[in-house]
A protein has these predicted regions:
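Nucleotide 5′-phosphate-binding alpha/beta core
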Residues: 1-86, 93-131, 138
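Conserved adenylate-forming
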Residues: 10, 17, 137-180
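Glycine-centered flexibility sites
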Residues: 89-92, 143
Length: 180
């Protein structure tokens, strides 16, 4: 618990120093603040202040939007540094999120841990050819974007990984999975 609190304090201090948006929000925090003392934020406010909440001051909403106009950029690094993802917008307010290499590595590790939490699942995966198929919405979303990123980084995995668009008719998804 102490380590988690220390890391949270470091993260909040970093955000406060490097993001004008969070710097303003965190300015009045007491010295001995707890997680519940942090002001809440929402997607609408974050997108309205996009250029102010990012901690990398070189990234702008205009540059991100320009990058996202080309669907060939799905799974590519913007400026050689960031994968760009969006939330689905199911609430009517999609949020654009940037992942650096560290964030992507942590996300990938957590995905593997969740997928193969049981030893028998990992054993079956190894025995049956080490192939994975995922069904995500196609676009700049975390699921499909991260699969495309992995395939760009490791093209030799092309026959081992597949992403199917969730909006594809079910019969077509089943056919593709059976062929895979």
């Amino acid at each position: 618990k102490a380590l988690a609190q220390k890391r949270l304090k470091e993260l909040a201090a970093y955000a406060g120093r490097n993001s004008p948006y969070y710097g303003r929000l965190y300015k009045e925090l007491p010295e001995d603040w707890k997680l519940t003392d942090l002001p809440t934020v929402n997607k609408v406010d974050l997108m309205a202040h996009f250029d102010m909440w990012l901690t990398d001051r070189t990234v702008t909403e205009g540059a991100v939007n320009s990058f996202m106009e080309d669907r060939e950029n799905i799974g590519r690094l913007m400026d050689g540094k960031y994968l760009i993802f969006t939330t689905s917008g199911s609430t009517g307010n999609p949020l654009v999120v940037l992942y650096d290499k560290t964030c992507m590595n942590i996300s990938s590790a957590l995905s593997v841990l969740r997928a193969y939490a049981r030893r028998e699942d990992l054993s079956a995966f190894i025995k049956k050819g080490k192939r994975t198929a995922s069904i995500f919405a196609e676009g700049f979303y975390l699921g499909s974007g991260s699969v495309k990123y992995q395939l760009r980084r490791m093209p030799w995995k092309k026959g081992m990984m597949m992403n199917l668009d969730v909006r594809t008719p079910t019969a077509e998804i089943v056919e593709k999975l059976n062929r895979f």
